[in-house]
Amino acid sequence: MMTDTVDDVDLPYDKDSASQQEKITALQERLEVLETQNEEMRDKLLDTNAENNKYQQKLERLTHENKKLKQSPLFVATVQEITDEGVIIKQHGNNQEALTEVTDEMREELEPDARVAVNNSLSIVKRLDKETDVRARVMQVEHSPDVTYEDIGGLEEQMQEVRETVEMPLDRPEMFAEVGIDPPSGVLLYGPPGTGKTMLAKAVANQTNASFIKMAGSELVHKFIGEGAKLVRDLFEVARENEPAVIFIDEIDAIASKRTDSKTSGDAEVQRTMMQLLAEMDGFDERGNIRIIAATNRFDMLDPAILRPGRFDRLIEVPKPNEDGREIIFQIHTRKMNVSDDVDFVELAEMADNASGADIKAVCTEAGMFAIRDDRTEIFMQDFVDAWEKIQQEASDETEVSRAFA
């Protein structure tokens, strides 16, 4: 292919009449234009290559996904026995047993009761993780709550008992070994609503390095037979896998109420769930380095079987705070509040007679709302007085409504 000569190119000047300087200037201008065009074309080429690479990656991904979708599904089975002749497996669903050969490498990974994936010819393809209900796994708290013992007031004796029952066996097990006693296995917190039972459990989770697994008793109540019991088994299995661990069961009366002669299927399923919980708490399987905390507002409803020593060794009452406790709780909840110097916590504690910790927190929040309503950033003593009167009035109205519908 021949290159164009100067005579063949459309020159930006008249070659017969233009001077030498005009020719040079015109050619320089043409060169600048061509360089700009070349730069633009180079950028477009880079963009096109990048776009092409992106589509190429997408094509490879879709091809890989298409290949996976066309693969035959694998069946789930359980290893029954490992023999010299091979591995005996039982398929899930049809309970069909089969003897299959495995490689030496795969044989080392297998053990009885292990879950495996098998193909159409019942050859073991890979080992699967243990079957654990995902609902039990999501109950594990990854991040410690921000509640500490300093955030709890008026419960010094209860805090000491909880720490002895839960924290010390996890942090200093050698002390119990030297004394020659088994550490307490569980603690039950009971008392009126709003007295700080859940906060005590949160403080334990914050203080210990153990895995903290939280759940409500109502989460274990299920419609179909065996679901609640299975969730209890999986819950303790998750705790064993993450030892040391603390299991907190809130509102345990939902599954541990006194057994009756009721013949309804719902009551029977709740009782089966409780039986599984009792078996896990003191069954033949070693529970290991796992501590249990439970909380309830209805101690009178609990079944005696769950209260015996060995299941819950400590039954700790969490009462409403006394006057000194109420003063401390007021100080705790107002630490970050912009309170005036005229606020008298002793007088507030006397005023809020028979109030729970939750009531006091509500009073502090309502006092702040009164200040905001008056477009103030400082909270006065009168705001707390008005807040207490409002909380009392709301409680009185709720009582009247409940009586009307009783």
Swiss-Prot record:
Pfam families for this protein: AAA (PF00004), AAA_lid_3 (PF17862)
Main location: cytoplasm
Cellular component aspect of the GO annotation: cytoplasm; proteasome-activating nucleotidase complex
Gene3D superfamilies: 1.10.8.60, Nucleic acid-binding proteins (2.40.50.140), P-loop containing nucleotide triphosphate hydrolases (3.40.50.300)
Coiled coil: 13-72
KO phenotype (gene knockout): Strains lacking panA gene alone display relatively normal growth rate and overall cell yield, but they are more sensitive to growth on organic versus inorganic nitrogen sources and hypo-osmotic stress, they show limited growth in the presence of L-canavanine and display enhanced thermotolerance. Moreover, strains lackings both panA and panB still show robust growth, demonstrating that the PAN proteins are not essential.
CDD domains for the chain: RecA-like_PAN_like (cd19502)
Region (Docks into pockets in the proteasome alpha-ring to cause gate opening): 404-406
Control of this protein's activity: ATPase activity is inhibited by EDTA in vitro.
Keyword Lyase: no
Compartments, record wording: Cytoplasm
Keywords for the protein's UniProt record, in alphabetical order: ATP-binding, Chaperone, Coiled coil, Cytoplasm, Nucleotide-binding, Proteasome
GO biological process: proteasomal protein catabolic process; protein unfolding
Additional comment: The biochemical properties of PAN 1 are highly dependent on molar concentrations of salt with a significant loss of ATPase activity and complex dissociation detected at 0.75 M NaCl.
Domain notes: Consists of three main regions, an N-terminal coiled-coil domain that may assist in substrate recognition, an interdomain involved in PAN hexamerization, and a C-terminal ATPase domain of the AAA type.
Family: Belongs to the AAA ATPase family.
Biological role: ATPase which is responsible for recognizing, binding, unfolding and translocation of substrate proteins into the archaeal 20S proteasome core particle. Is essential for opening the gate of the 20S proteasome via an interaction with its C-terminus, thereby allowing substrate entry and access to the site of proteolysis. Thus, the C-terminus of the proteasomal ATPase functions like a 'key in a lock' to induce gate opening and therefore regulate proteolysis.
Official protein name in the record: Proteasome-activating nucleotidase 1
Protein source organism: Haloferax volcanii (strain ATCC 29605 / DSM 3757 / JCM 8879 / NBRC 14742 / NCIMB 2012 / VKM B-1768 / DS2)
